[in-house]
Amino acid sequence: MTQDGTWSDESDWELDDADLADLAEAAPAPVLAIVGRPNVGKSTLVNRILGRREAVVQDIPGVTRDRVSYDALWNGRRFVVQDTGGWEPDAKGLQQLVAEQASVAMRTADAVVLVVDATVGATTADEAAARILLRSGKPVFLAANKVDSDKAEADAATLWSMGLGEPHAISAMHGRGVANLLDTVLKKLPEVAESVSAGGGPRRVALVGKPNVGKSSLLNKLAGDERSVVHDVAGTTVDPVDSLIELGGKVWRFVDTAGLRRKVGQASGHEFYASVRTRGAIDAAEVVVLLIDASQPLTEQDLRVLSMVIEAGRAVVLAYNKWDLVDEDRRDLLDREIDRELVQIRWAQRVNISAKTGRAVQKLVPAMETALASWDTRIPTGPLNSWIKEVVAATPPPVRGGKQPRILFATQATARPPTFVLFTTGFLEAGYRRFLERRLRETFGFEGSPIRINVRVREKRGAKRPGRR
């Protein structure tokens, strides 16, 4: 080591900082809503427009239950595609709730594509939708879907009777006619600037947890409207749904996700695919709010989801929901039980809430802010090495193979999550790395954020790129 306590070959040992800066948000883009009856091919059309599989597609009416927005690009034009649940004017129960979602999409979009199954023809529901859309004053385009051949063009022609102008004959499944439809639609949308804002955009929050734990209810309580379908059916929310919500004087981007099933491999159809998408939502988030049912014992599934969030390296807030269902004389006991069950992650932010009544929901914002501040934290190299020197002097690493490893140099390679690299003369046992993590937290905080400690062993003098252990 040099006199200032750093390894003399520091330039050879340091890792390059990963580029974790968020991509700048695009300028506000016009919204194109895709609406129609259940199972007419809306999500397939959305996927065709995007050129990738995003919307859940399955041959079962009602698979898409929430409004879902995706950024799209066509011939240099940026816009937002909004997928919706099936639109049924007189739907009951869950279908009625989805119909309300579609109605909101009609009101908030800049243009609407009404998708009709050309092989079925215009139904009473299709004609009712057309009348409502015409009254909206928005540009409306009629997509006659499932026209897979020239012979089927006649089916599309019968839809002139709906009064929406020319039916655009398409096959969302095979791509037929979709390009011409988009060219026509984009002529009615305002131009979108290609320049990208220098701002970072709202912090991203994923809501995760078992089915029916209260994710949608919490989102609605925070947003103050029925943004996400809430229904007393486990697994009601199928697609991740982004909502921009102002809380505590700032805007947050919430992603409401489908509950992870007991075992993803055992889920079938759209449930399996939505579970995979939930994993993607965790990866896309910066802070994850894990909802746990306080009225029930902690389950293996809860712990498995928590492990997945930590492995993804996201800031964490544990929200024990349905706290209002816990007897007051049991709450202190339950708090202690939770501390014992989660002893390995005492660093996680925790709040006890009721999404239904709104109890303590306001505590979520400070918890998320604390977790994100820890997640963003960087410790300068000088103070970090001074700290490691003091810790090692008081508690050296255990002897391994007759030799005691020395820590030569420490650096924080990245934030988000804070990741530290220790350059050593030998392998550090897992127990000692956990000890260092505890001491790091005692000194520097990191409340609500996982931290990672990687070790690079200097096998012999002069080795410039030692292997990671």
UniProtKB/Swiss-Prot annotation:
The protein's matches in Pfam families, at most eight in alphabetical order, are given as: KH_dom-like (PF14714), MMR_HSR1 (PF01926)
Asked if the Swiss-Prot or TrEMBL record annotates the protein with the keyword Methyltransferase, the reply is no
Task: Give me the disulphide-bonded residues.
Answer: none
Q: Which UniProt keywords apply?
A: GTP-binding, Nucleotide-binding, Repeat, Ribosome biogenesis
The record's listing under PROSITE patterns reads:
G_ENGA (PS51712)
Ranges for the KH-like domain? 377-459
| Gene3D superfamilies according to UniProt | 3.30.300.20, P-loop containing nucleotide triphosphate hydrolases
Q: Which family does it belong to?
A: Belongs to the TRAFAC class TrmE-Era-EngA-EngB-Septin-like GTPase superfamily. EngA (Der) GTPase family.
Q: What is the role of this chain? A: GTPase that plays an essential role in the late steps of ribosome biogenesis.
Q: What is the name attached to this protein's record? A: GTPase Der
Please spell out the taxonomic lineage of the organism that makes this protein. Bacteria, Bacillati, Actinomycetota, Actinomycetes, Mycobacteriales
Which gene name belongs to this protein?
A: der
